[in-house]
Amino acid sequence: MDQLNGKEQQEFQKIVEQKQMKDFMRLYSNLVERCFSDCVNDFTSAKLTSKEQNCIMRCSEKFLKHSERVGQRFQEQNAAMNQTMGR
């Protein structure tokens, strides 16, 4: 990144931010689709039942914890690869 001039760094940063937003939106969309499909079964009311609300809360927490764990493992593997390449 040090090889880039100011304008190139700004453009690079913009690309990174766009990718992060796209990744976040994909994560959010997957979360909504998964938890809605698994938890919402009663379409006779516009409101969620308490059972559906609890299911969605558990599903969301589990999904986010899993995503966080996968991200941590990816970072660990990436760091290990960088160490191996640096030798």
From Swiss-Prot:
Here the disulfide bonds are: C35-C59, C39-C55
Annotated InterPro entries: Mito_inner_translocase_sub (IPR050673), Tim10-like (IPR004217), Tim10-like_dom_sf (IPR035427)
Coiled-coil ranges (or none): none
Q: Tell me the Gene3D superfamilies matching this sequence.
A: Mitochondrial import inner membrane translocase subunit tim13 like domains
Question: Which terms in the GO cellular component ontology are assigned?
Answer: mitochondrial inner membrane
UniProt xrefs under Pfam families: zf-Tim10_DDP
User: What is the annotated localization of this protein?
Assistant: Mitochondrion inner membrane
Tree of life domain: Eukaryota
- Bilayer topology term: Peripheral membrane protein
Which family is this protein grouped under?
A: Belongs to the small Tim family.
Q: What role does this protein play?
A: Mitochondrial intermembrane chaperone that participates in the import and insertion of multi-pass transmembrane proteins into the mitochondrial inner membrane. Also required for the transfer of beta-barrel precursors from the TOM complex to the sorting and assembly machinery (SAM complex) of the outer membrane. Acts as a chaperone-like protein that protects the hydrophobic precursors from aggregation and guide them through the mitochondrial intermembrane space.
Quaternary structure (record): Heterohexamer; composed of 3 copies of TIM9 and 3 copies of TIM10, named soluble 70 kDa complex. Associates with the TIM22 complex, whose core is composed of TIM22 and TIM54. Interacts with the transmembrane regions of multi-pass transmembrane proteins in transit.
What does the record say about domains? The twin CX3C motif contains 4 conserved Cys residues that form 2 disulfide bonds in the mitochondrial intermembrane space. However, during the transit of TIM9 from cytoplasm into mitochondrion, the Cys residues probably coordinate zinc, thereby preventing folding and allowing its transfer across mitochondrial outer membrane.
Q: What is this protein called?
A: Mitochondrial import inner membrane translocase subunit TIM9
Query: What is the species listed in this Swiss-Prot or TrEMBL entry?
Result: Kluyveromyces lactis (strain ATCC 8585 / CBS 2359 / DSM 70799 / NBRC 1267 / NRRL Y-1140 / WM37)
